Amino acid sequence: MAAVTNADVEAVDFDPDDDDLMDEDAADPTPAPAPRLRSTIAGGGGGGGGGDDGQRKTKGRGFRDDAAPRDSRLAGAGRASDFDSLGSDGGPGPVRSIEGWIVLVTGVHEEAQEDDLHNIFRDFGQVKNLHLNLDRRTGFVKGYALIEYETFEEAQAAIKALDGTELLTQIISVDWAFSNGPVKRRNIRKRSPRRSRSPPRRRY
């Protein structure tokens, strides 16, 4: 009986180092894969909330909240109040801008300077603002200017006196920048009807 016991002991005998290795293998199981996170763009979140898709809002260029009132959307642009300030009595005629009475000058020479316009328009009143629109590519004037007066009488006097006059070898046109009623077109040439080069057909 003792011999059998010794044989059994010899059969199950093992190295202590192998026992340590087995313990380490049992203590370090294969780590479980991390849970997949939902994209924040899709409306979910890494925190596990993200189930309320009905309240999800899409932000970015080209998107807007249609449920918001139209006035609130326009308020951010800062332009609605400006147009509300444009006064008018409802009839045809010039309209005052927010700051004053603005005169439009067309036919301006491409090399004209602000001083060239200021010197002739200041004779009719205080010029509050003068703007020359330049071409970014060439740096020359695009051909028109905006001049602002404080009073209606000053702007009207400048229009009557300077419309059709010469500035730097070019004839300028001076008129109201804002007005009610039909738009008055200037310097528009009427084209003659085209004539056919083919000989007229003979009628039988």
Swiss-Prot record:
Gene: Y14A
Record bears the keyword RNA-binding: yes
Regions of compositional bias (Gly residues) in chain numbering: 42-52
Family statement: Belongs to the RBM8A family.
Gene Ontology annotations for the cellular component aspect, listed alphabetically: cytoplasm; exon-exon junction complex
Role this protein plays: Core component of the splicing-dependent multiprotein exon junction complex (EJC) deposited at splice junctions on mRNAs. The EJC is a dynamic structure consisting of core proteins and several peripheral nuclear and cytoplasmic associated factors that join the complex only transiently either during EJC assembly or during subsequent mRNA metabolism.
UniProt entry keywords in alphabetical sequence: Cytoplasm, mRNA processing, mRNA splicing, mRNA transport, Nonsense-mediated mRNA decay, Nucleus, RNA-binding, Translation regulation, Transport
Subunit structure: Heterodimer with MAGO1. Heterodimer with MAGO2. Part of the mRNA splicing-dependent exon junction complex (EJC); the core complex contains MLN51/CASC3, EIF4A3, MAGO and Y14.
Protein known as: RNA-binding protein Y14A
PROSITE patterns: RRM (PS50102)
Subcellular location: Nucleus; Cytoplasm
Extent of Basic and acidic residues compositional bias: 62-73
Alphabetized GO MF terms: mRNA binding
GO biological process, one term: regulation of translation
Organism: Oryza sativa subsp. japonica
UniProt-annotated stretches for the region Disordered: 1-92
Domain RRM: start-end pairs: 101-179
Ranges annotated as biased composition (Acidic residues): 10-27
